Every structure is written in C-alpha cells, then in structure tokens.
Regions:
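A glycine-/small-polar-enriched, mobile loop at the entrance of the PLP active site in fold-type I
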Residues: 1-19
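Generic structural marker for isolated residues within well-ordered, non-membrane alpha-helices
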Residues: 22
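Conserved PLP-enzyme active-site core in the AAT-like
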Residues: 10-14, 27-201
C-alpha cells in the first residue's frame, strides 16, 4: 500500500504515481496523453487555453453566454472572442473562413435550452478548417458515450470531481503535443498534482 509519492521524480519532473494515473486517464478516454492540473475544471480549461493560444489571439466560441469562470480566463489572457452559431454548420464554416480564429472552445453540454448542435459535427467542421479545438466536458464526462477528445477535439477538459475524485484537481486529456506544452509549465513541485491527490482520482 502507498499514499503516493511527493515532489519531482528525477527524469519525470513529476510524481511517479501522478504519471501512472494520467496514463490510466489517457487510456480510458482513448487519448494520446493526459495531464492532471490544479484548479479543477476551470484550471483544466486555463491550462488548455494557455497551451493553444497566446495573449491577444482569437478564440471562437458558441454564440451563447460564456460560463462565468471561463470568461474570467478569457479576460485574463486578453483573448479576442469570435462568436458563431454552432447550431448552424454553414454559418460556423463561414465565420471560420472569414475570421480565421486561432482556436475554438466548445462546451459539450448545451449553453442554452435551444442548442441542438452535434458535438462531433462541430468538431469535424473545425478540424477541416485547421482550427484547434478544446472541449469543456465538465458536465458531460461519464454521462456520455464519448467526450470531446473522442469526437475530434484536440483536448478535453474536466474536473476530476466529476469522476467522483478529489475536489480541486482538473484533467486535460487529448493530443500529446498539447499535453506536453502544459507539462512544460508545471516545472516546480508546488505546481504538480501530488501522488496522494492523483490516487484519489
């Protein structure tokens, strides 16, 4: 029995138990890689946006109210918002062609009662245009057959609390290159999810 390791394992730059749990998550969601981060679902979205975008770049979102904590991240990063109606794929394609967003954030669950878009179709439209996409799967993970990264998103983000795991731990799951950029920012022991926290996931 173990309560997990702490600090930075030489050669890994993270706790070994944390690395193992991340691999389990990646395997569970048929993804290349996963990273556990501080800050629950909001922290996961922040980490993913920072890996995909630089300050001042353009983020495409659905033409609907943006989740309040996500809006704070957008404002902190100084991102320019571009909106499109994800319910209308032709309108979405037109906005992408005209506005050339640098990345897109797609909420898996409905943002408003009238939303009817099919996540995989929206992601296919974005991928065809070469727009990197991350999905907010906070209210969908473990309640749907496939999360965003299994439907074509570059990465999915969610709180591990939604997996009945610990409060305050988030997960980013998806493309290895995006996860690698996130890991590059977690260079200190204090920024890591420690082994004991990872075991609770």
């Amino acid at each position: 029995l173990t309560c997990g390791d702490l600090g930075l394992t030489p050669g890994l730059n993270q706790p070994r138990i944390t690395q193992r749990v991340e691999q389990v998550l990646a395997d569970a969601f048929h993804a290349q890689a996963a990273a556990l981060v501080q800050g629950a679902g909001t922290g996961a979205i922040r980490a993913a946006l920072a890996a995909l975008l630089k300050s001042g770049q353009r983020l495409l979102v659905h033409d609907a109210p943006v989740y309040p904590t996500t809006r704070v991240i957008i404002e902190q990063m100084g991102l320019t918002l571009i909106t499109a109606d994800f319910n209308d794929l032709s309108a979405l394609k037109q906005v992408v062609d005209e506005q050339q967003p640098d990345a897109a954030l797609v909420q898996h669950t409905r943002q408003q009662p009238q939303d009817r878009y099919v996540l995989a179709d929206v992601l296919a439209t974005l991928r065809a245009a070469g727009v990197p996409a991350l999905t907010d799967d906070n209210y969908a993970v473990m309640k749907v057959a496939r999360i965003g990264c299994e439907c074509g998103a570059n990465v999915s983000t969610f709180s591990c609390f939604k997996l009945f795991g610990p409060e305050g731990v988030g997960a980013v799951v998806g493309d290895a290159d995006v996860i690698s950029r996130i890991r590059a920012t977690l260079y200190s022991g204090g920024s890591q999810i420690q082994g004991a926290q990872a075991l609770e996931v």
